[in-house]
Every structure is written in structure tokens, then in C-alpha cells.
């Protein structure tokens, strides 16, 4: 349908009037929240952790030296506006086929798009267009990070997928590299947000990895937006 000049201005004004929500997290909790939020007239930006190192994501980040695509894939699917079959295809996980076992097709597509566009950020941007995403999806950084946890017994456990299974109380968590730079667009999103949501998800493995990026943490602390955290 073609919009007249007046209709187009009304649509643009309607979008400008929407509350801007910046949501930080990873894992399945974030995707569940986004599926509900996209049904409402709000301007959503999801900023997704790049600390995942398990399963298909971990294999691709190790073999191809790219940020882990799994959490991003789930968020893209949650915010997509496509036929159900297309989303099912994007989320399909191979159960046989040798080296393909365990891989999600969406992860492989994001890896391929990273090769085509030259970096992970632009891959996510292009896939957002392909999937007609409602809102915006940003990786917290354009490179992978490793999450570490210092336990009460003094042990340092490395890897987001390994930390929960250690079974000891966590004293602190930190990233390597420590001086990782966020995607610049993330800073603009934080500064322009009316509401900042952290989570839902695991405090140590889904929420804190984003806050351990120094500039993201500083910008959230200084942002005038209302802030809420949903930690498990």
C-alpha cells in the first residue's frame, strides 16, 4: 500500500511518540519477554550479550572466530514478523548429519552473513531486514568475550556455559578482554531510552556480562531513563 504524504507523516509521528525501551540480556528469558513486548506500540532495542560459549554457538565462535550467534538468533526470531514456516526454518536444529549435528540453521546463516558483510554487527543488521524484525537487535560488542567467575573457594571458572555447573557460590565475575568496546549504536540507544530493562535471565551469565562492558555500565548508570532488573 502506498502512503500519501499526510499518511506517511502520521506514521512517522506515531513512531516518534512511542516509548523507547532498551533491553539488555541473553538466553531464553530475553526472547520470551520480547515476543510479548513486540505486540505493543513501543520502540524496542535489544542489546544481547556475546559471552555465550556453549553448543552450536561455542563451536562457531571457536572455529570461525566470530561472536556467538545463538542468543542473537533467538532474539531475531522473537522479534521477527515473517511466516511461521520461515521462523521454524531459521530456528531448525540438525539432529543428524555428522558435523551438522547440534547446529541451528540460523546460527549457520548468521555465520555466513558475517563472512559476507565483514563483521558480526552488520550481519545482525542485514538479518534483521531479512526477518522483518520489529524493533532493533544489537550485539553488545562486535567481538566475543569470555566470562569468568571467581568462586568462594578461590577457583576461577571460565566460560558462560561452565560456570553454573560448578556448584559453588560466586564471589565475582569478570570478562576478558577487560577493555572491550561496545557497539557505538548501543550508546545512542541508552542515551535516548525512556526505559532500560535488564533481563529477565540469570544474573551472572545473562545480565552481568553486558554490565561488565565499561562504557555500557557507565552509560546506564548516568542515563535519565527509568531502570528495572529482572534477575533469576
Indicate where each model-derived feature is located.
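Electropositive, gly/pro-rich neighborhoods at or near active sites that engage anionic ligands
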Residues: 51-168
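Gly/lys/ser-thr-rich phosphate-binding loops in alpha/beta enzymes
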Residues: 13-66
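Catalytic-core regions built around general acid/base machinery
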Residues: 189, 212-223
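A short helix->loop->beta-strand "cap" motif at the edges of active sites that frequently abuts
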Residues: 42, 223-228
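Glycine/threonine-rich flexible loop motifs
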Residues: 201-213
